[in-house]
Amino acid sequence: MSNQLSLFSEENVPFVNEVEIFNQTFGKINNYEPTIPEKKEWQFVYDFVLEELEEYRQACENGNIVEVLDAICDLTYVATGNGTMLHGLKDKIWPAYQEVQASNMSKTCATETEALETIAKRSKELSVACHFEKVGDRFVVYRSSDRKVMKSINYFKPDLSQFFTTEELAKNYLAETII
C-alpha cells in the first residue's frame, strides 16, 4: 500500500470525516448503522450529485479548470461524504474502496503469458481483435478497434458483501423506509 493510502483507515476517511463534522454542526443526518433512509433524504443526495455533475460538465465545456476542480470537490463531498454518512457506511467505505481498486487493477495481467491467454479468450468470445501493451510492470489488453480495456482472465468482481455482517445482509432495508 502506498504511503498516501496508508493515511486512510476505517476511522480516518478524508471527506467523510469532514462531512460528519459538517452534518453535526448544521443538524444534518449522520447514520452509524447501514440504512436506506426515507426517500426525501436519499433523493436530496441524489439530486445534489446530479446538480454537481452538471456543474462539472459545464466547467469542462467552458474550459474552466478552477470550476472543474470545484465540481470534483463538490461531487466528492456530496457523494462520498453525504452519501456515506446518510447510509451509515462510514466504517465500510474505505475497505470497500480498496476492494474496488483491487478489482479494477485485476483487469491487468501480471505476465505476458496471462496477457496472451486473455487475448485468446476475449478475441474468441467477442469475435474482435485484441492486443496488449506493457504498462509499468503490468500488461494491459485492449480491444484493437477502440482501445477498450479487456478484463484479464484473472479479473474478479469486487465482493462488497464481505463488509457487512450476516445480520446487516439479512435485513430488509426497504421495509423500514417510506418509498
Give a label for each model feature.
Residues S2-I72, T76-I179:
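Flexible "arm" and connector segments at domain edges
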